[in-house]
Design a protein with these regions (language model features):
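Beta-propeller domains
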Residues: 94-99, 103, 115-177, 185, ...
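Beta-rich, blade/repeat-based domains predominating
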Residues: 12-32, 40, 44-49, 65-84, ...
């Protein structure tokens, strides 16, 4: 049965126009983080920020330092503190896509940055796109067990790994390519499956294949293709992904179909990853 959506956050009348992105995450303390990449009247990207919104839908803060147009994020949440990795499209330079690490202190009343934000990866391709505004580093997935951050770089059409993501003091460049083959068509969202594999959505902005439209692709962290399925018969439908374990051997995947403006929920058996 279809669900009903309600508006959680909307800026007050007269506020500057926002450009909310897929840099969206919820902290365990109830605060919502969301990227904002506004444009001017000519469609030119302006300075972006990361907004902090409380559980009642009220903005209580924002961050801009070391953030150039936040496009997506991943969170390692310890309740009273968190590490947040933010991918940035940094418009203006076609090899300037980056990932910034923020260390946050979380209290009942707000969120603040500890220490200086650190750019831990850079050099990802960024390019304008008529449908998406811009293509660049997008989905992020963090493995706390190995301190590795995985990056879905849309314009590069590849998945990268960045080592020592939580501890490094400087940039690793782009990191290492772990997955890049004909199953990728502009990867966007990136999440872990319960078995440890990685799952990405193909936005079809790069090397689209009409025989493989709107695909969700699973692969191991060592770069072995596992499987794929499509969520829309047309290209450009696969967008955001959420996933959770709902039984001992069952994963529930929620996928945004951007063509139909729907959220599709699928239950799948969980196989063993690498």
């Amino acid at each position: 049965m279809p669900g009903n959506a309600i508006t959680f956050f909307q800026p007050p009348p007269g506020s500057p126009t926002l450009g909310l992105t897929t840099a969206l995450g919820v902290l365990r303390a109830g605060f919502v983080l969301v990227g904002n990449v506004p444009t001017d009247s000519n469609g030119v990207i302006q300075q972006g920020s990361l907004l902090v919104i409380d559980r009642n839908g009220k903005q209580v803060g924002s961050f801009t330092n070391q953030l150039g147009d936040p496009w997506d994020l991943a969170i390692d949440d310890e309740f009273d503190h968190a590490t947040v990795f933010v991918s940035n499209v940094n418009s203006g330079n076609n090899k300037n896509g980056s990932v910034t690490r923020l260390n946050l202190r979380i209290s009942p009343t707000g969120v603040s940055v500890i220490d200086t934000p650190t750019v831990i990866a850079n050099g990802y391709t960024v390019e304008p796109n008529g449908a998406a505004l811009v293509l660049g580093p997008t989905g992020l997935a963090y493995d706390a067990n190995t301190d590795t951050l995985y990056v879905a770089s849309t314009a590069d059409n590849a998945i990268f790994s960045v080592p020592r993501a939580a501890g490094r003091t400087g940039s690793a460049g782009t990191g290492d390519v772990i997955f890049q083959d004909d199953h990728l068509h502009g990867p966007l969202a990136l999440v872990f499956a319960p078995n440890g594999d990685l799952i990405t959505s193909n936005g079809d902005a790069v090397k689209p294949d009409p025989t493989q439209p709107s695909e969700i692709v699973e692969f191991t962290k060592s770069g072995k293709f596992v499987g794929q399925f499509n969520v829309d018969a047309g290209t450009g439908g696969a967008f955001g992904i959420g996933i959770a374990l709902v039984g001992q051997d069952t994963a529930r995947i929620a996928v945004v179909d951007d063509n139909a403006n729907d959220i599709i929920v699928i239950d799948q058996n969980v196989g063993q990853g690498d």
